[in-house]
Amino acid sequence: PDCLGPTTRVCPVCHTPWPSTFTADSPLIGLVGVRGSGKTIMLSVLAQELTTSIQRRFDAAIHPTGNRRLVSQLANWRSDMGRGGHLPSQTETYQHVSKDQRDSAEPAVFEWQLADGRNRQRSTIFSFYDTAGEDLASMDRTRELNYLAATDGVILLLDPFGFTGNHDLARSKGVDEDLLHDRPEDVLRNIVELLRQADQVGSKKKISRPLAVVVSKIDAFFDSIDEDSPLRRPSSDQPYFDEAESLEVHEHVAMLLDEWSGGGLLRMLELNFSTFR
């Protein structure tokens, strides 16, 4: 800069300080889902797992970086839940916050450091955003989520009670009727439309951006899932991504979604994304 003084690199949008290892290759992950699916809870648990079991498994050093306000909130929520306290409140919708609040919204940023086996260190920055489920209930609101167009990958969190095949079970368990109105298929359709427009992908091609589909609250269905199912077995503790294990879980989740009247969502995934699990 012209002042020739010390400077700090920050994101031009949310003003989160960038670590020295941040580059254009550092992935930004968007976390989206229907209202009440548990996105903030998942992010709270993910933040803890990254800095404990995951870094041990991969012999890595993983730590929060930049502005840690959201990371601190996630840690407080996780601690409160562990003590049997309250769950985090619903994330405020995009349209219900001021422009200043939108512009200052911060991701949870983690730096993953790993030895590459040649006496050198590799570092990757992961950023996670939390989005209110109501923001994805209509295409008009979804278009306002400009950051989704900049993500390198998207995590879609689904509430199993949102599938029509589980509505009766949801009511028997006292699930709020209002949470059954937003269909998972509608949220996925809006995401597909946004990403197609952002990437200028025509109807004859598939979206190349990876999509991870996560089903929350799966423990509510353990009575109907065998104990030896891949969905209930502990995951691998080997220091690498287990492709066979991932594919096995993928196939079992797909079968569950089909049983829950989610066949339309599965076909939408297959027809619109080249990479998804």
Model-derived segments and their meaning:
Residues 1-102, 115-126:
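Conserved G1/Walker A P-loop phosphate-binding module
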Residues 11-13, 21-28, 104-107, 132, ...:
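Short linear interaction motifs
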Residues 14-15, 46, 110-113, 188-199:
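Short, well-ordered amphipathic alpha-helices
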Residues 17-19, 94-101, 110-118, 139-145, ...:
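Catalytic micro-motifs at enzyme active sites that drive phosphoryl/nucleotidyl and oxygen chemistry
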Residues 29-33, 126-130, 210-217, 275-276:
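Extended hydrophobic secondary-structure segments that form protein cores and membrane-embedded regions
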Residues 35, 114-116, 128, 132-135, ...:
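Short, flexible loop/turn elements at secondary-structure junctions
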Residues 117-120, 144-245, 250-272:
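Conserved C-terminal guanine-recognition region of P-loop GTPase G domains, centered on the G4
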Residues 122-142:
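Switch II (G3) loop of P-loop NTPases
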